């Protein structure tokens, strides 16, 4: 009786206790195993009840369907399969079952035949099917001719990468749910994820992470018709459809591998609300894939997506919270090892490796195994014929021309089938259209529509230009992306006519669009564009004409030059034009005359050199840019020392080559007679590089007038710069902002300034780590120099003592300085006393900036005393952020009444408030006030002072510029100002109203003022909530020819789509009006006073 009660107690209550110990995910797993192990005699299990059951309900269901001891027997088996050994042991001890009833083996996830059958839902058959399908993973053709042990080394490296793809991020602590494996075409992405499928099926990868892994290939998916997601993932299941409910029941244990995203021919433009989450409903496959990628379908599931670098930007727009991993391919050591194993003659190997490594772009391409093999094969043929591999490796186009030609070269007496010109043109058109549309997989029907017959395709397959996919029917691809890009470039060389306005011209034939493309916006076009320029080389053309026995036209040269001229005359800034990419293309031509012609319309270039290849192409092209006047340049990484890891002798390394390229680049300073400005910034130059630069600066033919060396580290201080200042009589402007020259560096500069041969007029030393100790040297230089008129010492810790020394020079009659900036130099009221005396005695100083110093009201009083002195000739005074209050308004008002020279005053970011401004306005509207530019930005003003400001606008005929930004004027205040702006005697040309709390309510007043005022040409309205209604009101005026506004400060992206359309329409109707967010009056071309600092 006791036994009976005991056995009934545990099924009724004891089992519930154990179920309570399972977390939510473990409970779901328990239910799935329960579904799999239900005994047949019980008939259909009420799965819907089990799936929804809480723990107590589940215990009751098990009692019902497994009476007596059977419930515990099933439960213990499930606990064992879930590897919950502790629960198994505790349960067995409590119910004291004998070993015969429940043996130890029953509590483990055993491998008996019974358990294999019971756990059919674990995907055993599916795993077997995957093993059959993916057993041949590593494509031995990808590295033809290499030893097996080399192949094994690459496999081991990439296997480790696979194992850690879904590891927890050590920085964020998050486990990635979406991993994007990106890399160049052919680098091995597909091979790697197929290997992942095989390893998972064999039980050696992701076993604790994913219960099911599914492989979805882009090429196959493109050919599928409408279906459900369940049908899509069941394609590899042994039966018609897998145990889909079980699979979907725990989506967090699913991994979907989406291979070759770049080959999916889907636009992915479906709105999110239209996407599907029901895996049983049929949809177009494009909808299913979009739903999966955008986490609408099975949001808990994990994704591993492979894509080429050229389409990663397109993929990024679809994904949320993804983790990028780049597959780099063969390392430098691996490439070297491969080359040395490919060539039996080690001298040949050394020559090939050295030649490839000298071209960083080409050597980078060889990270792809197939490209490395092709390069070695091609260069080996060249060397066997006695050719110069150095020339072949000079450009990527030269090497690929050689390789493509080798595919049609007779071997062993055989004669390859050459395509006729029509066939070749059709192939090139297919390639070009594919590159433009990012189509890399072609189906038989597509090729037929594009003009390639099956006979044509077979011919190109025989020549290893095109290959048929062995697994997916009717799929064709070029043997490598670079092969497609090369034939795409050839399309433009075979095109017969380049007449303008040809109505039959297709988008991919637009050369102007191709030239304007950038690697950031259109990375898929970059290499094709390089190949196109490379094919302009006459030697390349002759080689291809011999190979294909056809005629290629160089008429495209003149067409490209026309497009370059249009770009050169456009409004694009140098940074927008992407000169580095252009130089890559021009370098491919190796045609000096063409480069000179192409660059004749570009007076200014901006390039950022951060790789050796950048230095190579820039130095080559800049020598032939004869019309250059300005070079803006940044050089990083290139000159950093590195430990060499190569078996080559050290004299073959590219250190000498880097020096030679830098020498070539710097030689432009004396070979280009038009060059006037060099802006070298944020650059790391070693001692040798700096010596080369200074040597060129001292060259007698160097005509440079303006030299900017901002944020530069000088290995040997400023001695070389100082010497250049003496030798180069053309140099008038030197900017060393952010360069850590220190007091010692300034000492050297001051010695040069005192030299009679030094003609420097402008010296900018902002943020140069200067202290009071350099001020005596500067003071002496100011007295001795007869040319220096502009000195900027901002953001240096000079303090009042340093300024005292400078003021001694300012009071000297031989000091010729006209403009001085001491912004953020640690000055106080004490420093103003010295400056005040200097202003009275100095007859030449016209511009003084004291911004960002704690002068206080006492300091302003001292400056005001100087201003009202009759001998003070100051024209511009900047007191921005000087920590004074409305009390200073009284001092300034008095001095401004007497001062006749001051025309520009900046009082921004001080606590003036309405009362202070009202005091100033009494002076500003006085007929004798000569003020032209007034800066009151951020002065804690409200609409209460706007009547006074309006009075100034009306009564001061000299006032041209007024900035009231960052004040709480609101709509009522602007309405008052607009009333004044409408008067015909208003002379305001620039008005700043940024961040003034404006809404759409003031836009009608602004519109009215813009119509009436014929002098207002610049207005800033950024950081206001004008909204769509406000833009509608402004739109009517802005598009009118009566509106004379030239620059309007507005951020288009801050408005909704409809408002943005209106602003775009304004640009069409009124092309003279520029709308931009950075409506900055302080531009170099503007003669506004503030730019002088």
Curated annotation (Swiss-Prot):
InterPro entries: DAPIN, DEATH-like_dom_sf, Leu-rich_rpt, LRR_dom_sf, NACHT_NTPase, NLRP_HD2, NLRP_innate_immun_reg, NOD1/2_WH
LRR repeat coordinates: 730-750, 759-780, 787-807, 816-836, 844-864, 873-894, 901-921, 930-951, 958-978, 987-1008, 1015-1035
UniProt: ATP binding residues: 183-190
Gene Ontology CC terms, in alphabetical order: cytoplasm
Molecular function terms, GO-annotated: ATP binding
Pfam families per record: LRR_6 (PF13516), NACHT (PF05729), NLRC4_HD2 (PF17776), NOD2_WH (PF17779), PYRIN (PF02758)
Domain NACHT, residue spans: 177-499
GO biological process per UniProt: cell differentiation; regulation of inflammatory response; spermatogenesis
Residues covered by region (Disordered): 102-121
Expression tissues: Testis-specific.
Entry's localization field: Cytoplasm
Entry comment, domain topic: Upon heterologous expression, a small proportion of the isolated Pyrin domain forms homodimers and higher oligomers.
Protein family according to the UniProt entry: Belongs to the NLRP family.
Protein task: May be involved in inflammation and spermatogenesis.
Protein name: NACHT, LRR and PYD domains-containing protein 14
Organism: Homo sapiens (Human)
């Amino acid at each position: 009786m006791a036994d009976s009660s005991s056995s009934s107690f545990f099924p009724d209550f004891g089992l519930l206790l154990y179920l309570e110990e399972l977390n939510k995910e473990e409970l779901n797993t328990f239910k799935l195993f329960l579904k799999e192990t239900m005994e047949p005699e019980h008939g259909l299990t009420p799965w819907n009840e089990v799936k929804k059951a809480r723990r107590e309900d589940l215990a009751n269901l098990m009692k019902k369907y497994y009476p007596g001891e059977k419930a515990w027997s099933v439960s213990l088996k499930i606990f064992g399969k879930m590897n919950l050994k502790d629960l198994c042991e505790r349960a067995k001890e409590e119910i004291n079952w004998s070993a015969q009833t429940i043996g130890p083996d029953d509590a483990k996830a055993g491998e008996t035949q019974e358990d294999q059958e019971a756990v059919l839902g674990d995907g055993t058959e599916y795993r077997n099917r995957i093993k059959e399908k993916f057993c041949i993973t590593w494509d031995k053709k990808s590295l033809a001719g290499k030893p097996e042990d080399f192949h094994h080394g690459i496999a081991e490296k990439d296997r480790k990468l696979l194992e850690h793809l879904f590891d927890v991020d050590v920085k964020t602590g998050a486990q990635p749910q979406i991993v994007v494996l990106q890399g160049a075409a052919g680098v091995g992405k597909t091979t790697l994820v197929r290997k992942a499928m095989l390893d998972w099926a064999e039980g050696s990868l992701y076993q604790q992470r994913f219960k099911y892994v599914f492989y979805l290939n882009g090429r196959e998916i493109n050919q599928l018709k409408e279906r459900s997601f369940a049908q899509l993932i069941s394609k590899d299941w042994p039966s018609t459809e897998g145990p889909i409910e079980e699979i979907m029941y725990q989506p967090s244990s699913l991994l979907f591998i989406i291979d070759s995203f770049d080959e999916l021919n889907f636009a992915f433009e479906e709105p999110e609300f239209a996407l599907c989450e029901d895996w049983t409903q049929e949809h177009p496959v494009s909808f299913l894939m979009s739903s999966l990628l955008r986490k609408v379908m099975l949001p808990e599931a994990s994704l591993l997506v492979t894509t080429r670098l050229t389409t990663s930007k397109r993929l990024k727009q679809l994904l949320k919270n993804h983790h990028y991993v780049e597959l780099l391919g063969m390392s430098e050591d691996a490439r070297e090892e491969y080359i040395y194993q490919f060539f039996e003659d080690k001298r040949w190997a050394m020559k090939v490796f050295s030649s490839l490594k000298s071209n960083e772009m080409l050597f980078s391409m060889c990270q792809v195994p197939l490209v490395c093999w092709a390069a070695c094969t091609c260069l080996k043929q060249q060397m066997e014929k006695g050719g110069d591999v150095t020339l072949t490796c000079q450009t990527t186009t030269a090497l690929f021309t050689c390789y493509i030609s080798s595919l049609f070269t007779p071997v062993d007496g055989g004669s390859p089938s050459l395509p006729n010109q029509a066939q070749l043109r059709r192939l090139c058109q297919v390639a070009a259209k594919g590159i433009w549309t990012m189509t890399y997989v072609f189906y038989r029907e597509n090729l037929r529509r594009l003009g390639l017959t099956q006979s044509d395709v077979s011919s190109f397959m025989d020549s290893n230009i095109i290959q048929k996919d062995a697994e997916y029917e009717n799929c064709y691809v070029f043997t490598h992306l670079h092969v497609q890009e090369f034939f795409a470039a050839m399309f433009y060389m075979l095109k017969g006519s380049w007449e303008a306005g040809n109505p039959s011209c297709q988008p991919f034939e637009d050369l102007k669009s191709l030239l304007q493309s950038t690697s950031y916006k259109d990375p898929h076009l970059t290499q094709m564009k390089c190949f196109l320029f490379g094919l302009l080389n006459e030697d390349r053309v002759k080689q291809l004409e011999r190979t294909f026995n056809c005629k290629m036209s160089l008429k495209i040269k003149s067409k490209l030059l026309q497009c370059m001229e249009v770009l050169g005359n456009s409004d694009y800034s140098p940074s927008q034009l992407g000169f580095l990419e252009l130089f890559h293309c021009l370098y491919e031509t190796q045609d000096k005359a063409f480069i000179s012609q192409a660059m004749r319309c570009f007076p200014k270039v901006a390039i950022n050199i951060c790789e050796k290849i950048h230095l190579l192409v820039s130095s080559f092209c800049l020598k032939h840019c004869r019309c250059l006047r300005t070079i803006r340049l940044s050089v990083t990484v290139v000159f950093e020392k590195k430990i060499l890891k190569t078996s080559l002798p050290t004299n073959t390394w590219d250190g000498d080559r880097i020096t030679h390229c830098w020498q070539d680049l710097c030689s432009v300073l004396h070979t280009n007679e038009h060059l006037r400005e060099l802006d070298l910034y944020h650059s790391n130059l070693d001692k040798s590089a700096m010596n080369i630069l200074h040597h060129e600066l001292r060259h007698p033919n160097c005509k440079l007038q303006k030299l900017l060396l901002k944020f530069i580290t000088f290995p040997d201080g400023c001695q070389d710069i100082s010497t250049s200042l003496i030798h180069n009589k053309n140099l008038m402007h030197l900017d060393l902002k952010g360069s850590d020259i220190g007091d010692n560096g300034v000492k050297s500069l001051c010695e040069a300034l005192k030299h009679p041969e030094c003609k420097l007029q402008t010296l900018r030393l902002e943020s140069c780590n200067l202290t009071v100790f350099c001020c005596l040297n500067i003071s002496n230089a100011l007295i001795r120099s007869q040319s220096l008129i502009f000195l900027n010492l901002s953001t240096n810790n000079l303090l009042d003592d340093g300024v005292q020394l400078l003021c001694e020079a300012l009071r000297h009659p031989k000091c010729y300085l006209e403009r001085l900036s001491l912004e953020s130099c640690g000055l106080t009221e004490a420093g103003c006393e010295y400056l005040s005396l200097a202003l009275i005695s100095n007859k030449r100083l016209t511009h003084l900036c004291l911004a960002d110093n704690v002068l206080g009201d006492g300091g302003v009083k001292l400056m005001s005393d100087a201003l009202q002195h009759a001998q003070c000739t100051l024209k511009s005074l900047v007191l921005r952020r000087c920590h004074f209050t409305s009390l200073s308004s009284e001092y300034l008002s008095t001095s401004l009444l007497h001062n006749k020279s001051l025309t520009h005053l900046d009082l921004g970011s001080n606590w003036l408030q309405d009362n202070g401004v009202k005091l100033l306005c009494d002076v500003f509207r006085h007929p004798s006030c000569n003020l032209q530019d007034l800066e009151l930005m951020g002065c804690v003003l409200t609409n209460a002072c706007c009547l006074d400001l309006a009075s100034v606008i009306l009564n001061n005929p000299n006032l041209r510029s007024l900035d009231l930004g960052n004040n709480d004027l609101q709509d009522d205040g602007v309405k008052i100002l607009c009333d004044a702006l409408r008067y015909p005697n208003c002379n305001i040309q620039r008005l700043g109203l940024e961040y003034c709390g404006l809404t759409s309510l003031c836009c009608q007043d602004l519109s009215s003022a813009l119509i009436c005022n014929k002098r207002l040409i610049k207005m800033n309205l950024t950081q206001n909530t004008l909204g769509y209604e406000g833009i509608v009101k402004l739109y009517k005026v802005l598009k009118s020819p009566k509106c004379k506004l030239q620059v309007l400060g507005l951020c288009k992206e801050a408005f909704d789509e409809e408002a943005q359309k209106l602003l775009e329409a304004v640009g069409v109707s009124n092309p003279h009006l520029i709308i931009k967010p950075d409506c900055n009056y302080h531009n170099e071309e503007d003669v506004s006073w503030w730019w002088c600092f």
